[in-house]
Amino acid sequence: MLKSKFWLIKAPWYVVPYFLLSVFIAGYFYIDPPYKITNNFLSQLGQIYVNEKLNLVSFLLFNIGLFNVGFVISLFYYNLFYFLNVEQINIFFLRALQILGILSGICFAGVGIFPTDITFSYHVFFANYSFYFLLAVSILQTILIFKTNVLSNQYAFGYMMFCVFLALYVRLLLFGGNPAEGMPEGMFQAKHVISQKLIVLTIMIATLHQSIGINYYYKKQLNV
């Protein structure tokens, strides 16, 4: 069950809409003060308490959704190794892609397991490293797609653009300063908050784009 093309083709199309819907509903039920798209991070939806008020509905929706995203990312990259290895290309790069992809998924799941208001240091660790690992993954994946005939180079060019956006976001994480500086308590600078939301959306789109290419390959093989 873990080794299955289901995780490459169908699972992303289940988990991405589910997560996006969870975010919208969690934002609606976010405890007072209202959730602000430009000044509240996504992970604030997953807080257990907001201003000492129980934020149970948003907490459950967001964290379960994000855990599922991390779970699917891990299994996506576990199976991508076998998908790309049909041509016996560089096994070292492939194995590195698999391991780093799984670690990235574990980190995304970790963000959902450790709420920011209860376990802040663990939350920040998993949040940051999910993007660090994913940047390495996106670089390796771009290289490997260029090296193989399994996927068209259009998917490599798409992932190359994703690499650029992700690298800019990682730069912001490392050198963008304190996002809370000069902001009221519980609010953060818009450049950090909006960038986070855009890169998460980009991750979703990039994954679905890859899934389309993989599905096309399998369909083409059936017609050979």
Language-model segments: residues:
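Cytoplasmic juxtamembrane regions at transmembrane-helix boundaries
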Residues: 75-102
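N-terminal signal-anchor transmembrane alpha helix
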Residues: 3-32
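Interfacial helix-start motif at the membrane-water boundary
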Residues: 47-71
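Interfacial/capping segments of alpha-helical transmembrane domains
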Residues: 28-43
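Terminal transmembrane helical module of multi-pass membrane proteins
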Residues: 140-224
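C-terminal ends of transmembrane alpha-helices
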Residues: 21, 25-26, 35, 106-120, ...
